Amino acid sequence: MSTKEKLISHVMKEEPVGSRNKVTVVGVGMVGMASAISILLKDLCDELAMVDVMEDKLKGEVMDLQHGSLFLKTKIVGDKDYSVTANSKVVVVTAGARQQEGESRLNLVQRNVNIFKFIIPNIVKYSPNCILMVVSNPVDILTYVAWKLSGFPRHRVIGSGTNLDSARFRHLIGEKLHLHPSSCHAWIVGEHGDSSVPVWSGVNVAGVSLQGLNPQMGTEGDGEDWKAIHKEVVDGAYEVIKLKGYTSWAIGMSVADLVESIIKNMHKVHPVSTLVQGMHGVKDEVFLSVPCVLGNSGLTDVIHMTLKAEEEKQVQKSAETLWGVQKELIL
């Protein structure tokens, strides 16, 4: 008899039971690992699968996390073969060519489209009913690419979008007012990145409109220069990349925030990237961030946000820029 047989007596033969809320992270780079640890520490799934083409790096990261299993409640698996991702509830795609210092997100695009042509069909093969969350940049275009390549309905393909931009915005407003970001309600919509749109008309604390107190807020004529806060949001990622070489922690936490709303069916409103054709005067098939309700089925509803004419014009301009790139893509 083996030690195990001496220690344990079987009462019944267990039938293999699949995971109820499995999450997969594709890509074990800085963003993938920050997303993985954020998901693990929030205890969001009973199984976390990780997949990447770089076998040694993947194996090392998975082992490193598994060594912490005592402190977690989640089974951690990893392989370069996508069969390890089978029956995932949510698949988070962080893989792709990394943005170089000074490189615009749009510049990355065709490099990443080619990577997606391998990734997306594999996800669909093993998790045909999953909710697909795209994090790789440029996120709005790649969410469109993932939607096209997957054949999924639009409510099951979500881009992480401006969830992080809005978090940065709320943090900076909070710094200026000496308040916690959760008490500063503010939204950034449109493109994740350089042409994102701050909705100054909606910024409020405890229901008090800040633009009601300072009608010039967000304009050139504002003596308090609130506009600089949005510039800081846009420059924030470039600044972090310049200082440490990449961004990871905040986007990882943002991803876990979105995964939580889906897995726990919270019906929470997030600014995420979705198909906005027909909204805010957008005519083309583009994905941009607007406030959306996230739950177990994915993206269930879109909130009709009241935008001022100038804000709406900026959203349309973003859409035109993205469509200009998208129509050149070889899918």
Curated annotation (Swiss-Prot):
Gene3D superfamilies tied to this protein: Lactate dehydrogenase/glycoside hydrolase, family 4, C-terminal, NAD(P)-binding Rossmann-like Domain
Keyword Phosphoprotein: no
Location of this chain's protein in the cell: Cytoplasm
Principal location class: cytoplasm
Pfam families named in the record: Ldh_1_C, Ldh_1_N
UniProt entry keywords in alphabetical sequence: Cytoplasm, NAD, Oxidoreductase
Active site residues according to the UniProt entry: 192 (proton acceptor)
Binding residue positions for substrate: 105, 137, 168, 247
InterPro entries: L-lactate/malate_DH, L-lactate_DH, L-lactate_DH_AS, Lactate/malate_DH_C, Lactate/malate_DH_N, Lactate_DH/Glyco_Ohase_4_C, NAD(P)-bd_dom_sf
Pathway terms, separated by semicolons: Fermentation; pyruvate fermentation to lactate; (S)-lactate from pyruvate: step 1/1
MF (Gene Ontology): L-lactate dehydrogenase activity
Positions that bind NAD(+): 29-57, 98, 137
GO biological process: lactate metabolic process
Catalyzed reactions: (S)-lactate + NAD(+) = pyruvate + NADH + H(+)
GO cellular component assignments: cytoplasm
Family indicated by similarity: Belongs to the LDH/MDH superfamily. LDH family.
PANTHER family: L-2-HYDROXYCARBOXYLATE DEHYDROGENASE (NAD(P)(+)), L-LACTATE DEHYDROGENASE A CHAIN
Quaternary data: Homotetramer.
Function: Interconverts simultaneously and stereospecifically pyruvate and lactate with concomitant interconversion of NADH and NAD(+).
Name under which the protein is recorded: L-lactate dehydrogenase A chain
Originating species: Gobionotothen gibberifrons
Gene: ldha
